[in-house]
Amino acid sequence: MSDSLNAAALDQLFRTARTQNAFADTPVSQEVLRELYELVKWGSTAANSGPARFVFVTSADGKAKLKPALSEGNAAKTLAAPVTVIVAHDEDFHEKLPYLFPHADAKSWFDGPREGRAESAFRNGSLQGAYLILAARALGLDAGPMSGFDNAKVDAAFFAGTPIKSNFLVNLGYGDPAGLFPRSPRLSFDEAARFE
């Protein structure tokens, strides 16, 4: 690994980054979203499985399809956001492992009933969703992740007849500070971690 990032980069990724509730009326281009994925795909996952699947909802039709699944408290901000990413995972991710992990027969590790690999798909897809948030911040975007929606409705609307399941949503764009709440505290090291 190379040198540590400078303080400004760490601030942008972590210390001064906020969960955004409102965004400027500025579109996010498909080129930027493709660049975002090109960063996300390099994040580590078990056996290089990369089970996450992303739907970048940007059109009026896409937002209309998403709207019935949103909780009342998340609907307005999600419909107004330039981009809403459905972070999902493919429970048949193992079918791609001969390509993604060619130096071992990793596909055989996950053969069998889908339920047996769903946990790995969820865990590693969640990792990739976190990478997406950090990659977005690295590209100058703001993010508003949330789980206040009906997964079954999203799955029916966007993934019907597939082994893909939604996990959480992330609104993306250029944040409007007027929509921020005061910064909430975080647990100290001693409250959240220990040495053994």
UniProtKB/Swiss-Prot annotation:
Top-rank taxon: Bacteria
SUPFAM superfamilies per UniProt: FMN-dependent nitroreductase-like
Named cofactor requirement(s): FMN
GO molecular function: oxidoreductase activity
Keywords: Flavoprotein, FMN, NAD, NADP, Oxidoreductase
Keyword NADP assigned: yes
CDD domains recorded: RutE-like
Any Pfam family matching the protein: Nitroreductase
E.C. numbers: 1.-.-.-
Entries under PANTHER family matching the protein: MALONIC SEMIALDEHYDE REDUCTASE RUTE-RELATED
HAMAP family listed in its UniProt record: Oxidoreductase_RutE_HadB
Stated family: Belongs to the nitroreductase family. HadB/RutE subfamily.
Name the UniProt record assigns to this protein: Putative NADH dehydrogenase/NAD(P)H nitroreductase PXO_03909
